[in-house]
Amino acid sequence: MERLEAFNPQRLQWCMTDAQIDIGHLANDVGISERTLARAIEGEIGLTFLQLQKLGKYFGRTPLFFLEEGTPEPQQIRSPQFRTLLNQQHNLDQKIKRIIQLAEWQREAYIDLLDELDAEDRIDFDPPDLTNATPISAARQARQWLEIGSEHTFEQFRSAIERRGILVFRANGYAGKWQIPSTHPTIGFSLYHSSYPIIVVRKESVEARQTFTLAHELGHLLLFRESTIDSVESLNSHARKERLANEFAGHFLIPQESLNQIDASSLSDEPEVLESQLQDFRRLWGVSTDTILIRLIASNRLEQAVYDDFKEWRGSRPAEQSAGGSREWRHREPKHILGDTYVRAVLQALDTNKLTLVKASKYLDDLKLTDIKRLERYYAGA
């Protein structure tokens, strides 16, 4: 295959420095020999288009990126939202950077799709002004704005949020470009835009955890109107914004009138008994025992020591494992990752010939054409 002499080694070096990866690890990850990459970086040879595709996929760039002249400037190739996250976490690894880029690309694709559809019912993101609101008041106003009633599952909260013009993406449980590994500290992030802001939540083996992350990221968007990235440590952080986002999430998921249903005086000090006593409430509200206990402590209805004992007991138990899943349901993955609102827009564009099958595949997480047909039948109820 022909080598492209227009290959710009400076751009590959920039990507490697940005990703904090050396040539040996890059060669192993992309399947190009270390010697070939070394010679290309030294300007001795060009690279083939297929090799540029591999590099582009790895770094979240197009093959043409490596053919352009000059060294890229961060402000030219990264959005202000992306740069905000990088300022918060200077050593953000390449896996998370690629997911941020992917989320931004999906947002742009969705907006372009709405233009193609000439959608008159485009949703305006017009949240209540919560600038000076307390977390309790903000959570109450947010529930009213989202018209939250008996919603208690992740998908129900997600649908309510999407109806108000926020894109909610959930990282995949399978290995792939959308996967945030369960061992990775990042649990989610939000990218603030005046229209169609983004929330990305890591898939968890326990749904209540990802539901809390969803509410936490919603708090960041509504309370502070800024982009942020969160790790497991964020949920225990005493930093002002993290603390307020956590309080918001707790009150959003468990309003005071719901919490009042619990007779705290009857709760046991024994962690295992306590877990059993709160089981019905966990299922009713779609939250974890931790969220309930923290709300009770904040309401001065439970001693901190009870929760400390519970955490110690929980930490001694084997971690819950996800069942994994079957690739037989690959055609439904775009709905789980991108959300029902997004997938319906793509299928509508496909049905009205506004989108080709090939382009629809790219919009739907590179779904194979046969799986797109299965997805269409699934939505048609066949």
What is the role of each PLM region?
Residues 1-382:
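Active-site hotspot residues in diverse enzymes, especially metal/ion-binding acidic/histidine motifs
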